[in-house]
Structure formats: C-alpha cells, structure tokens
A protein has these predicted regions:
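Phosphate/NTP-binding elements of NTP-utilizing enzymes
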Residues: 2-185
Length: 185
C-alpha cells in the first residue's frame, strides 16, 4: 500500500525515535505497540511520527477508511495520559461516535491494568491514578469541554463534523501549554 505524506520529513515506513527532549510522546511507542501485539500500518506510522515531531503542533491525517486512525490516535492518547497530570480530549461529531473511543480507552486501561480513580460513563471521563484525565466530547456540545487545559486533543472523524468553529473558537485556546498538540483524523 502506498502512503502519500505531504511533509517530506514524516516517514511512514518506520517509527522515528527522537531524543527525549524533542519528542511529544515521553514514553517509547514501539515497545508499547509490541505489548499490544500491534504492527502499525504505514499510515499509522506517519501519524505517530508527525505527532512526535516537535515541528508540528497540529496534525491532520486524511487517511482512507479502515486504516486504524481512531485506534492509533487512542493509543497515542493513552501514552500521553501515562505522564502524570496530563489532560486528553477526544472529540467526535456526536456522543455515539465518542463511545467508540471511550470503549477503546477502557480496553487499553484494562489491558495494562492501570488504576482508575474515576470512570464516569455518563460524562465519558476517565481519570487514572496519576491524575491524568481522558475526556470525550462532542462537537454538538463543545461548550462542555472548555475551561480546561489540554495536552492533546484528538478530533476523531473530523471530516464528518462541521467542527472548524468548534476548534478555532472553543478548543484551540485550551491548548495553552507549550507542547500541547491536536490530531485531526
């Protein structure tokens, strides 16, 4: 399968290991994927390399269906949550689509036997024992996601939502940390 990447410095055939100061993901993703028994596709490798590259704050991945965009983005989100006190927001066009990521996060947490201090299915918020939170949001109710500072925003199914204003007006200001990033898939 041929993957076309618009940025020449983003590889899609191998995960690039950067120095610890430069990379966004503070934990190595390769061994983590091995523990999950996941062999990433070229499109997933490109997403990993793009988000890890300090040059790019906003990563937009226009990738065909059934390529594991949501899955790899959730793995990236969980890796970020393993850094104490991190806040991750996963946005979807509606709450029924956000349930996919909520279930994925629960399964990843269960797989690695992480201690959960809060698992609120109604509000779709998970807090792990290191103080990190993973929150699901909907473009339809973006106001419920503001007022916090996020380390990572994952905008799932970005092509399905008219979320330009939701991101630019409501969510972009929540990426107020020096190294905070967003992925649009």
């Amino acid at each position: 399968m041929t993957v076309e990447v618009s940025r020449r410095d983003i590889l899609c055939d191998e995960i690039v290991e950067l120095g610890s100061e430069a990379k966004f993901l503070k934990l190595p993703i390769g061994p983590y994927l091995n523990l999950l028994n996941v062999t990433p596709l070229p499109s997933q490798i490109a997403i990993i390399n793009a988000i890890n590259n300090p040059k790019y704050r906003f990563v937009s991945a226009a990738v065909s269906r059934r390529q594991g965009k949501t899955y790899i983005a959730n793995i990236i989100g969980q890796l970020v949550s393993l850094v104490p006190g991190s806040n991750i927001l996963i946005m979807s066009p509606n709450y029924s689509l956000s349930q996919i990521s909520f279930d994925l996060q629960r399964n990843l947490i269960k797989h690695f036997d992480l201690e959960v201090t809060k698992d609120n299915a109604k509000d779709k918020v998970i807090e792990i024992s290191n103080g990190s939170t993973v929150r699901m949001g909907s473009v339809n109710q973006v106001d419920s996601c503001v007022g916090r500072s996020y380390d990572l925003i994952i905008f799932d199914e970005a092509a399905l939502a008219d979320g330009k204003d939701a991101f630019n007006v409501a969510l972009r200001p929540t990426l107020d940390k020096e190294n905070s990033k967003a992925i649009f898939i």
